[in-house]
Amino acid sequence: MGQKVNPIGLRLGINRTWDSRWFAGKNEYGKLLHEDMAIRAALMKTLKQAAVSKIIIERPHKKCRVTIHSARPGVVIGKKGADIDKIRKLVAKMTDSEVLINIVEVRKPEIDATLVADSIAQQLERRVAFRRAMKRAVQSAMRLGAEGIRINCSGRLGGAEIARLEWYREGRVPLHTLRADVDYGTATAHTAYGACGIKVWIFKGEILEHDPMAQDKKMAEQDHGGGGGDRRRRDRDAA
């Protein structure tokens, strides 16, 4: 099942958290959920050139805090903050709450799965060869510290008559390991021949903070100087 399910959804509550962080009663829940979906769709459409990775929505008391993670924060903010005021007004039309906008810069867009997928989609729309686009993305991600990456491209690649799926993988991408930090992103390239789907998995290493077995092992290694040498020495002294 790890091969089929969305890796982010599988890890929610383990090493990932939700993009919508609020609580509502059953009367309000549906309304707020639809608000979130409308806000995200509008912002993604408005900020198409800003390389938006994700949008986090939090709702403290009578407020709506929207945090935009972008690789190009300057495009979001605009000259002297003009564009951010437009975004605030756009979001304010969709919700009754007071709107707060935060911008967070994505430092390494090459290892953000959503941004990698969007980049490949844009290249396919510009008629760049799909193999070259995939290979370039894989090399950039591995160079910037990813432990593994897998990219799937499916559709009428290169204008072929029959749709097919092509994929590249480098390093390891453990989809079943729940403590693995696996980022996942998708995008659609609307080419002259039809739509092509892009899926990207990026493995950034294992998160061991919440793993009691890993913590016990780490403590044992610190106590014994990082190996079994001390134990062997004690056994020899006792003999």
Curated annotation (Swiss-Prot):
Q: Which residues form a coiled coil?
A: none
Q: How does it assemble?
A: Part of the 30S ribosomal subunit. Forms a tight complex with proteins S10 and S14.
- What is this protein's name? Small ribosomal subunit protein uS3
MF (Gene Ontology): mRNA binding; rRNA binding; structural constituent of ribosome
State any GO BP term from the record. Answer: translation
* Similarity comment: family membership: Belongs to the universal ribosomal protein uS3 family.
According to the record, the residues making up region (Disordered) are 214-239
Gene3D superfamilies with a match to the protein in the record: 3.30.300.20, Ribosomal protein S3, C-terminal domain (3.30.1140.32)
Q: KH type-2 domain spans which residues?
A: 39-107
Record's keyword annotation contains RNA-binding:
yes
Would you say which domain of life the source belongs to? Bacteria
Provide GO CC annotations from the record. cytosolic small ribosomal subunit
Quote the gene name from the UniProt entry: rpsC
The protein's matches in InterPro entries, at most eight in alphabetical order, are given as: KH_dom, KH_dom-like_a/b, KH_dom_type_2, KH_sf_prok-type, Ribosomal_S3_C_sf, Ribosomal_uS3_bac-typ, Ribosomal_uS3_C, Ribosomal_uS3_CS
Q: Which PROSITE patterns match?
A: KH_TYPE_2 (PS50823), RIBOSOMAL_S3 (PS00548)
Q: What is the purpose of this protein? A: Binds the lower part of the 30S subunit head. Binds mRNA in the 70S ribosome, positioning it for translation.
Q: Which UniProt keywords apply?
A: Ribonucleoprotein, Ribosomal protein, RNA-binding, rRNA-binding
